[in-house]
């Protein structure tokens, strides 16, 4: 089953339960700006390249989980996420209630060596297939980018407004599993207390710093929207567990 087949099956399932979507207008944005790029944004999150299928060094780090990047591995894990992940399926369901089709998703090489994925209104979600990674990271990247797509659908984000981007980055970090405690510990970002908030803020600032339009105001933009956006888990009632 291809990625597109997985999406089609989900759409058919959701449409059977929500016939009203047929009457909803699906809006297409006429610009192609990268809304957000999911990046490794600190040295503690770097994943070293490997020539082997798996690495076995670093018993207490992410190294032992890392796999050699291939397009097939990317596609298989993206398809698995679409078929099995209830969090992603719920986001898609809620997008369709708003009258938005989920974005197209593809696995392809990315120019940036620290990018895991990105979202643009026209091209959809791109998952980087040339970055050493591991299945859970691919899953989190897919959900992360779909949070951005949901926010674009619901809130009509302005891709040139750094505060808008800061808010969706905070939400994506919270809702995707990026800041799961076990992952943070493996990345050596230790901290028992308030680790979720610290991780979400760090990742949001890092993402904005990689955006040429926002790099000089990244921390200010995140701090300005922090109180509101860090408590915004919609369409969930709280941070979902993975």
Curated annotation (Swiss-Prot):
Gene Ontology terms: biological process: mitochondrial protein processing; mitochondrial proton-transporting ATP synthase complex assembly
Keyword Protease among record annotations: yes
Any one Pfam family match given in the protein's UniProt record, by short name: Peptidase_M76
Keywords, sorted A to Z: Hydrolase, Metal-binding, Metalloprotease, Protease
Catalytic-site annotation from UniProt: 145
Binding residue positions for a divalent metal cation: 144, 148
InterPro entries linked: Peptidase_M76_ATP23
GO molecular function, one term: metalloendopeptidase activity
E.C. designation(s): 3.4.24.-
One Gene Ontology CC term in the entry: mitochondrion
Entry keyword Protein transport: no
Similarity field: Belongs to the peptidase M76 family.
Stored PANTHER family: MITOCHONDRIAL INNER MEMBRANE PROTEASE (PTHR21711), MITOCHONDRIAL INNER MEMBRANE PROTEASE ATP23 HOMOLOG (PTHR21711:SF0)
Protein name: Mitochondrial inner membrane protease ATP23 homolog
Organism: Dictyostelium discoideum
Native organism taxonomy: Eukaryota, Amoebozoa, Evosea, Eumycetozoa, Dictyostelia
């Amino acid at each position: 089953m291809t990625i597109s087949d997985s999406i089609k099956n989900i759409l058919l399932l959701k449409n059977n339960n929500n016939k009203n979507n047929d009457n909803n207008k699906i809006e297409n944005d006429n610009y192609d700006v990268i809304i957000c790029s999911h990046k490794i944004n600190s040295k503690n999150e770097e994943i070293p390249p490997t020539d082997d299928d798996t690495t076995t060094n670093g018993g207490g780090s992410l190294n032992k989980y890392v796999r050699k990047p291939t397009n097939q591995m990317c596609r298989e894990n993206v398809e698995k996420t679409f078929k099995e992940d209830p969090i992603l399926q719920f986001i898609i369901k809620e997008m369709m209630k708003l009258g938005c089709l989920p974005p197209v998703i593809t696995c392809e090489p990315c120019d940036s060596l620290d990018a895991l994925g990105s979202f643009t209104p026209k091209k959809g979600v791109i998952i980087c297939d040339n970055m050493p990674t591991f299945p859970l990271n691919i899953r989190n990247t897919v959900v992360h980018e779909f949070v951005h797509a949901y926010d674009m659908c619901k809130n009509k984000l302005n891709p040139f407004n750094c505060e808008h981007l800061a808010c969706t980055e905070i939400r994506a970090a919270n809702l995707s599993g990026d800041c799961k405690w076990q992952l943070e510990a493996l990345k050596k970002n230790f901290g028992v207390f308030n680790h979720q908030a610290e991780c979400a803020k760090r990742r949001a600032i890092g993402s904005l710093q990689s955006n040429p339009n926002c790099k000089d105001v990244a921390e200010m933009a995140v701090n300005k929207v922090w109180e509101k956006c860090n408590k915004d888990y919609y369409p969930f009632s709280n941070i979902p567990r993975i």
